[in-house]
């Protein structure tokens, strides 16, 4: 038998199984029967789906196929109840079928069975049919018996008479129900993975670095394997405890996501348990493989304070340290007060703040970004912008001596140099361990906590400032 070298063309000829072949008639409910849908999305990559459908269930013991659920559903979290009566519906059995129809699965289900194959006949100038038996599909290669020969990688197309009953085109919940009403309004709820949201903030500051306009966006990512049209949307901000069961059938969802944006719809916020709940004011479409952005907040002229901070290290006080730490970087930060007086005063979900500033031509330039944690109202937000280019520092240990088995005394000198044409204010943060005492210093220090003291110094334009201090540390 001579086989053509033409590329394999997969053609699946699918014929629906006759109802008479089924063990019992099944009731089917699809997404087109949804009357209500709401989703609550958590910023830990999962969500709660609640939907209401009106279904012709029938009475007695019935099988219901509940289709168009999320592909990333956690079936052990599913709950169903009737809204038509307290005892109108009871669940006898629940199954989740996710053995999905693919060319490979179709072949696997036909191992040991007959199929029809077609190959190109050069002499006839058309495809020629043959009966074949599928022997194996192991390793992704199809082995078949055609006539008296066994072959693999057949260069043609394969046709199947029908789809095996246990292969589903979409993930489907199947319930065996005891129904007392023929037509019922049914509510189903479940958790699904791959629904996520995050906050993205855009902060445009003024020329003086003293204020700016802050816009907060909710970015919703739906890779759950389902679309939710005209859905009521709620978001939960907070760290919700979850348990991993270690038994996850779900597949990773790939593909590029579409992006849509809406600046008009706004969220209302409320405290909920020990978290915060944000509710979108009107329904929205959350489509499969989509990123949607909705405005969370807008604050005009929010005051901000730029800070230059120079950090030390705890371990420097434990031993003699001979090396000079030269040209150490000075961090640049923006401090923003989350208060009503500052145009904010609402719980800020964790997310990324991206900061922009206009140059002399008026064009906005990106100047830094940082992640912020969940921030309650009336708390400070600190944004790390980067490191100063023109302000640097040196640190060196001038003296070090032991005063006992676990007590030492050391003298340090910090030199800050400012290469800008205007003065700069720099905060020096000195973390220190053990039981410590400031013996002497050239500048006033501030004890922030048990293990931190600071200096707040002015560094003149194109000049330098030296700070010298002696500290005694007991660590046992």
Residues of each region from the PLM?
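Long, intrinsically disordered, low-complexity accessory segments associated with secretion
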Residues: 2-7, 16-476
């Amino acid at each position: 038998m001579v086989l053509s070298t033409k590329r394999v063309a997969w053609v699946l000829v699918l014929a629906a199984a006759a109802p008479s072949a089924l063990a019992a008639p099944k009731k089917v409910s699809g997404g087109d029967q949804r009357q209500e849908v709401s989703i609550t999305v958590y910023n830990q990559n999962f969500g709660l789906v609640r939907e209401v459908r009106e279904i012709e269930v029938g009475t007695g013991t019935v099988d219901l196929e509940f289709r168009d659920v999320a592909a990333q559903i956690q079936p052990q979290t599913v709950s169903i109840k009737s809204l038509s009566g307290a005892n109108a519906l009871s669940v006898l059995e629940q199954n989740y079928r996710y053995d999905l129809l693919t060319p490979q699965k179709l072949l696997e289900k036909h191992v040991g069975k007959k199929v029809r194959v077609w190959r190109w006949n050069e002499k006839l100038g058309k495809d020629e049919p043959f009966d074949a038996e599928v022997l194996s599909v192991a390793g992704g290669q199809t082995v078949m018996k055609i006539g008296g020969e066994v072959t693999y990688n057949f260069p043609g197309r394969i046709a199947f008479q029908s789809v095996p009953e246990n292969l589903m085109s979409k993930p489907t919940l199947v319930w065996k129900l005891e129904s007392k009403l023929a037509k019922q309004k049914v509510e189903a709820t479940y958790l699904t993975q791959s629904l996520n949201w995050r906050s993205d903030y855009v902060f445009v500051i003024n020329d003086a670095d003293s204020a700016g306009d802050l816009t907060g966006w909710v970015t919703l990512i739906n890779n759950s394997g389902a679309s939710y049209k005209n859905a009521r949307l709620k978001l939960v901000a907070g760290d919700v405890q979850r348990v991993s069961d270690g038994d996850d059938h779900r597949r990773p969802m790939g593909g590029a996501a579409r992006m849509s944006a809406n600046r008009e719809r706004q969220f209302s916020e409320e405290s909920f348990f020990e978290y915060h709940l944000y509710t979108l004011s009107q329904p929205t479409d959350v489509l499969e493989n989509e990123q949607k952005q909705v405005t969370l907040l807008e604050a005009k002229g929010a005051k901000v304070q730029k800070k230059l901070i120079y950090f030390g290290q705890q371990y420097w006080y434990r031993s003699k340290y001979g090396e000079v730490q030269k040209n150490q970087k000075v961090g640049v930060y923006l401090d923003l007060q989350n208060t009503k007086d500052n145009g904010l005063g609402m719980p800020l979900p964790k997310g990324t703040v991206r900061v922009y500033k206009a140059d002399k031509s008026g064009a906005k330039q990106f100047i830094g970004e940082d992640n912020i944690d969940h921030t309650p109202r009336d708390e400070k937000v600190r944004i790390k912008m980067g490191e100063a280019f023109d302000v640097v520092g040196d640190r060196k240990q001038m003296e070090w001596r032991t005063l006992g088995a676990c007590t030492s005394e050391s003298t340090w000198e910090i030199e800050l140099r400012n290469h800008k044409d205007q003065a700069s204010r720099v905060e020096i943060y000195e973390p220190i361990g053990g039981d410590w005492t400031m013996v002497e210093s050239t500048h006033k220090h501030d004890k922030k906590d048990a293990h931190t003291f600071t200096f707040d110094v002015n560094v003149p334009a194109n000049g330098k400032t030296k700070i010298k201090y002696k500290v005694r540390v007991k660590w046992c």
